[in-house]
């Protein structure tokens, strides 16, 4: 399977380079990207996608890894130009403060939320068949203070507790049933690895909460010159199937384990700002 993926991706990249008329390396530019690392290798898909994008544009990627940073520090570094690029859920506020690359990059997986819950609590969630049922549970989602999901949950009438500072404290607070920390919504592309790292929690087996938003890349304003290059190249990668191949490479196994197609879908309204 990996050999097929590599062959398909390589062929797709060659086609992009050919179609784009980039056979000459005379115009190749060295694109320097300083990017943060995330715990548990969660950055790998996004780094590989950026590498493909720069190469597909006919340029040479020079990727500098800036080390591990929490999200609030990544945000500050992007605003100051200390790092070049990162991925966030797209919002108008972020669009105004940074330079958006307006190409969705996870196939919507990040907007499809599955719950981490304390062990032994599955029967509580088995009663849920609709958004109204979920609201009536009275359970509070545990979320990072500045996260977009806070706005999504509140818009849909779902109670929230926010964690200031290090959001990773949420795991043990949910496991310990700290008041207000009843469950932790995670992206379908994140939750399997997180559950393995936190065996005191379990993956809720019935529900999937879905809202219409995806990650996009954001550049610091100091690196706005890369916007057109990356936007056009990511569109080519998406159209060629390379992005889908990468998504399958990193997350197909997780989707199978999660029994994605058998879950009860609860659709959530999405804030406009």
Feature map (PLM): residue ranges:
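Ligand-binding clefts/hinges and TM-proximal coupling segments of bilobed small-molecule sensing domains
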Residues: 144-155, 234-273
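Ligand-binding cleft/hinge of the Venus flytrap
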Residues: 49-62, 129-135, 145-168, 195-200
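Short loop->beta-strand "edge-of-pocket" segments that line small-molecule binding or catalytic clefts
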Residues: 29-43, 128-146, 182
């Amino acid at each position: 399977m990996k050999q097929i993926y590599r062959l398909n991706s390589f062929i797709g990249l060659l086609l992009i380079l050919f179609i784009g008329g980039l056979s000459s390396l005379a115009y190749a530019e060295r694109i320097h990207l300083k990017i943060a690392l995330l715990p548990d290798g969660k950055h790998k898909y996004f780094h590989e996608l950026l590498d493909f994008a720069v190469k597909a544009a006919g340029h040479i990627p020079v990727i500098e890894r800036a080390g591990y940073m929490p999200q609030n520090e990544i945000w500050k570094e992007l605003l100051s130009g200390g790092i070049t690029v990162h991925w966030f859920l797209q919002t108008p506020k972020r669009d105004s403060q940074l330079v958006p690359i307006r190409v969705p990059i996870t196939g919507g997986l990040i907007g499809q939320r599955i719950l981490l819950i304390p062990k032994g609590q599955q029967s509580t969630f088995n009663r849920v068949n609709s958004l109204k049922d979920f609201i009536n549970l009275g359970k509070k989602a545990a979320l990072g203070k500045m996260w977009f999901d806070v706005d999504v949950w509140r818009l849909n009438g779902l109670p929230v507790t926010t964690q200031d500072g290090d959001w990773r404290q949420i795991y043990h607070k949910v496991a310990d049933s700290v008041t207000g920390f009843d469950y932790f919504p995670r992206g379908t592309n994140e939750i399997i690895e997180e559950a393995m790292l936190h065996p005191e929690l379990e993956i809720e087996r019935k529900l999937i909460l879905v809202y219409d938003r995806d990650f996009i890349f954001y550049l610091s304003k100091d690196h706005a010159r890369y916007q057109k290059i990356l936007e056009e190249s990511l569109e080519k990668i998406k159209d060629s199937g390379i992005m889908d191949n990468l998504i399958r490479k990193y997350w197909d196994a997780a989707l199978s384990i999660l029994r994605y197609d058998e879950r009860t879908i609860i659709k959530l309204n999405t804030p406009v700002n």
